[in-house]
């Protein structure tokens, strides 16, 4: 969920300009993508530009996110690869920073690697926290993860959308991240995904980003607000139900967007006969739909 914050290092170090990255690569650095053909080819070409390959990624081999993409892969005689991992764009971003600054590529995912230390420094500034004693570990794709309270995470997302209290270079970097995410919603996630659909409908006004274990974040650029959600049992569908209702409650959903996102406000539950047998509904009194 914090990939857009981590990707600030790609801009601020000059690595993005040094390797002539476009909005597509910036968006992929922020993405939890489906591993569809478009995602895989773009990341592969990006790595080739660095003189690297999928073998240089520390994220493990994965299958594409969707059944449709998995079937297409198998029919083509393909197999799971590191390029299909939903975090491969983030890893390509870290490798780009390492190459640009002349740091070793090997071990780019280690907590003590200069790339990760730079990323942690940015995270400290954006969250307003000293993270030295914060809980630390490794996430599923092999990158350091740090425990941050939801309030500080929401502050970081608010600053991504409105970085007026940050240095000028940070403000420019935040703007570039926002533009890339808004310009390439498909690359952020993929066909039918919540993140992609919301960004397609609202653009830079509401940039949402999924995370693991029921974490979801958003920046509401025009409102200067950040959102950070954590569902206790890690359920993503619950996080999405809360996020869409928060966007509506905070006035971020235009009438046009509501029309496009109607089946996200109360997602239908289908039987195996494809009949609607229920809906996913947020029941919190301040977020529940009327009726």
Language-model segments: what does each one mean?
Residues 1-16:
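Active-site SXXK
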Residues 3-7, 153, 224:
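Residue-level preference for non-acidic, small/hydrophobic
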Residues 5, 38, 86, 90, ...:
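Conserved active-site and cofactor/substrate-binding residues in soluble primary-metabolism enzymes
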Residues 17, 102-110, 133, 160-171:
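Inter-helical turn/loop segments and adjacent helix faces that build the functional surface
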Residues 20-30, 57-60, 135-139, 169-183:
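Beta-strand segments within the central parallel beta-sheet cores of soluble alpha/beta enzyme folds
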Residues 21-133:
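Active-site-adjacent helix/loop patches that line small-molecule binding or acyl-intermediate pockets
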Residues 134-155, 159-169:
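Internal, well-folded beta-alpha domain core
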Residues 158-291:
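Structured C-terminal helix/loop/strand segments within mature extracytoplasmic catalytic/sensor domains
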């Amino acid at each position: 969920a914090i990939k857009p914050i981590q990707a600030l290092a790609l801009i601020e170090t000059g690595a993005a300009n040094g390797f002539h990255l476009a909005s597509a690569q910036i968006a992929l650095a922020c993405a939890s993508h489906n591993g569809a053909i478009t995602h895989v080819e773009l990341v592969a070409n990006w790595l080739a530009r660095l003189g690297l390959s999928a073998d240089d990624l520390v994220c493990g081999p994965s299958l594409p996110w969707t059944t449709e993409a998995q079937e297409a892969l198998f029919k083509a005689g393909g197999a799971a690869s590191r390029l299909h991992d939903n975090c491969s764009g983030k890893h390509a971003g870290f490798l780009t920073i390492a190459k640009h600054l002349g740091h070793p590529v090997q071990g780019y995912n280690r907590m003590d690697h200069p790339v990760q230390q730079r990323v942690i420094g940015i995270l400290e500034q954006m969250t307003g926290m000293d993270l030295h004693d914060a809980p630390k570990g490794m996430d599923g794709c092999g990158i350091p993860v740090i425990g941050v309270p939801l309030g500080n995470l929401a502050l970081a997302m608010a600053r991504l959308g409105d970085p007026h209290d940050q240095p000028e270079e940070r403000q420019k970097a935040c703007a570039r991240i926002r533009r890339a995410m808004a310009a390439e919603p498909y690359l952020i996630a993929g066909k039918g995904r919540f993140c992609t659909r919301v960004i397609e409908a609202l653009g830079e006004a509401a940039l949402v980003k999924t995370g693991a274990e029921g974490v979801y974040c958003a920046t509401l650029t025009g409102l200067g607000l950040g959102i950070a959600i954590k569902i206790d049992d890690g359920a993503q569908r619950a996080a999405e139900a809360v996020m869409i209702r928060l966007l509506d409650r905070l006035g971020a959903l235009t009438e046009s967007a509501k029309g496009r996102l109607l089946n996200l406000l109360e997602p239908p539950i289908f039987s195996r006969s494809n009949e609607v047998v229920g809906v996913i509904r947020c029941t919190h009194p301040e977020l529940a739909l009327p009726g």
